[in-house]
Amino acid sequence: MRKLALVPIQFYRYAISPLMASHCRFYPSCSCYAYEAIDNHGLLRGGWLSIRRLGRCHPWNPGGYDPVPAVPTSRSSSMAE
């Protein structure tokens, strides 16, 4: 399901986005952020992070560097080391 959700984002990034001028006020761009968020966090959490990011993408937000949050590590894997 995750990979299927990434297809429209890839289509936008490679077919539509090059035809438009760069307008994203964030780095990475909103489409790159959405792709990375869904790929790293899954469809539900990554989708929610993407929606929140798109909600911040407006003229009154200064933008800037806004990376995808790191995937939380489980306590059991950190205790095993």
Swiss-Prot record:
Localisation: Cell inner membrane
Disulfide bond annotation, renumbered to this chain: none
Statement: the UniProt record of this protein carries the keyword Cell inner membrane: yes
A single Gene Ontology CC term: plasma membrane
Source superkingdom: Bacteria
Membrane topology note: Peripheral membrane protein
Keywords per UniProt: Cell inner membrane, Cell membrane, Membrane
Recorded family membership: Belongs to the UPF0161 family.
Biological function: Could be involved in insertion of integral membrane proteins into the membrane.
Name of the protein: Putative membrane protein insertion efficiency factor
Gene source species: Pseudomonas syringae pv. tomato (strain ATCC BAA-871 / DC3000)
